[in-house]
């Protein structure tokens, strides 16, 4: 745990309905209990401006390139106003979604879009990538059942199983592309506390 006493950037990734936000919250609470200076944030969002952009992104019908640029603009504000200052102050930053979600939700809709997402990120913030990313691996059929049981929904929630499978395959591909950064946590048959224990082993 000593390596978390200085600033460290941790992200949680995966499709909807996988328990990703739950795990981010559990890790946040655990690190606080260890007297670690830690903040929990999310994307798209995390700042007042970025949250306004999020509302447009998740509810309005945008052209694919417009959607990507909206997500990137929100991230820039989030990084500049919140993430970077916290890291500079020595905090651990836990973020519920980051660049990999943009690749799998917005990048997939564009030709060569995934590479475009990472190239844009290098231009905007060339030195900021997570030290570790947890991909919560839950089968799409299970994930969509969980989403359908929720009362709230946005345009991504209602796209159907084919969309969920496409996003899932994208995250799997990214975990193979960036194996040193992305740690896959197979969670389909595990309880939240069991998943949390697996995550702690990587810290």
From Swiss-Prot:
A Pfam family per the record: Thymidylate_kin
Entry GO terms, CC: cytosol
Residues annotated for ATP binding in this entry: 14-21
Transferase recorded as keyword: yes
Alphabetical UniProt keywords: ATP-binding, Kinase, Nucleotide biosynthesis, Nucleotide-binding, Transferase
EC supergroup of this enzyme: transferase
GO molecular function: ATP binding; dTMP kinase activity
SUPFAM superfamilies xrefs: P-loop containing nucleoside triphosphate hydrolases
Record-level GO BP terms: dTDP biosynthetic process; dTTP biosynthetic process; dUDP biosynthetic process
UniProt xrefs under InterPro entries: P-loop_NTPase (IPR027417), Thymidylate_kin-like_dom (IPR039430), Thymidylate_kin_CS (IPR018095), Thymidylate_kinase (IPR018094)
Catalytic activity field: dTMP + ATP = dTDP + ADP
Record-listed E.C. numbers: 2.7.4.9
NCBIfam families assigned: DTMP_kinase
Similarity field: Belongs to the thymidylate kinase family.
Annotated function: Phosphorylation of dTMP to form dTDP in both de novo and salvage pathways of dTTP synthesis.
Protein name according to UniProt: Thymidylate kinase
Organism the protein comes from: Rickettsia akari (strain Hartford)
Classification of source organism: Bacteria, Pseudomonadati, Pseudomonadota, Alphaproteobacteria, Rickettsiales
